[in-house]
């Protein structure tokens, strides 16, 4: 069985199943999970929905490379990345990033690294529907600053 699970899907994900898979090995001492959700407010406007597009082969390749970099840098055991695409409503879960390791420090750092690179380097395109209309979301300076520390 592989120690990496990567999925890009329209349907909601099961956090509990992903967590169980991450932490089922007896050598795991720490499991760190991040779950991102659709916010109801962005850039000062009320958000009603978010539409995510991607190119499947490109996206899966980018996610696989990001996870491989994390595994090369930290002593981690399992990684699970699930990213949703399609139409999402306010409050819906968008992304799950989970990392297990023998020690918490490795798991925390690897999880944050994966999330930072996923947010800036994975080819997802986001269109928000707000009270002001629709708009494509661009990368923020803070996202690039997060990458610079790695």
From Swiss-Prot:
InterPro entries: MoaE_sf, Mopterin_biosynth_MoaE. It catalyses: 2 [molybdopterin-synthase sulfur-carrier protein]-C-terminal-Gly-aminoethanethioate + cyclic pyranopterin phosphate + H2O = molybdopterin + 2 [molybdopterin-synthase sulfur-carrier protein]-C-terminal Gly-Gly + 2 H(+). Its EC number is 2.8.1.12. This is Molybdopterin synthase catalytic subunit. Belongs to the MoaE family. Heterotetramer of 2 MoaD subunits and 2 MoaE subunits. Also stable as homodimer. The enzyme changes between these two forms during catalysis. It comes from Pasteurella multocida (strain Pm70). One of its GO terms (biological process) is Mo-molybdopterin cofactor biosynthetic process. The keyword Transferase applies. Substrate binds at residues 37-39, 103-104, 119, 126-128. Pathway: Cofactor biosynthesis; molybdopterin biosynthesis. Converts molybdopterin precursor Z into molybdopterin. This requires the incorporation of two sulfur atoms into precursor Z to generate a dithiolene group. The sulfur is provided by MoaD. CDD domains: MoaE. Keywords: Molybdenum cofactor biosynthesis, Transferase. GO terms for molecular function: molybdopterin synthase activity.
């Amino acid at each position: 069985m592989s120690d990496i699970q990567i999925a890009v899907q329209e349907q909601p994900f099961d956090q509990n199943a992903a967590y169980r898979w991450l932490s089922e090995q007896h050598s795991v001492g720490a499991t760190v999970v991040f779950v991102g959700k659709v916010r109801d407010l962005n850039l000062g406007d009320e958000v009603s929905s978010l539409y995510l597009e991607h190119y499947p082969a490109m996206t899966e390749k980018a996610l696989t490379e990001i996870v491989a970099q994390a595994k090369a840098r930290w002593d981690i055991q399992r990684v699970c990345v699930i990213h949703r695409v399609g139409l999402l409503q306010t409050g819906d879960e968008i992304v799950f990033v989970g990392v297990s390791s023998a020690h918490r420090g490795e798991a925390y750092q690897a999880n944050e690294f994966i999330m930072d690179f996923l947010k800036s380097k994975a080819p997802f395109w986001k269109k928000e529907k707000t009270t002001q209309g629709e708009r494509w979301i661009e990368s923020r300076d803070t996202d690039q600053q997060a990458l610079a520390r790695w």
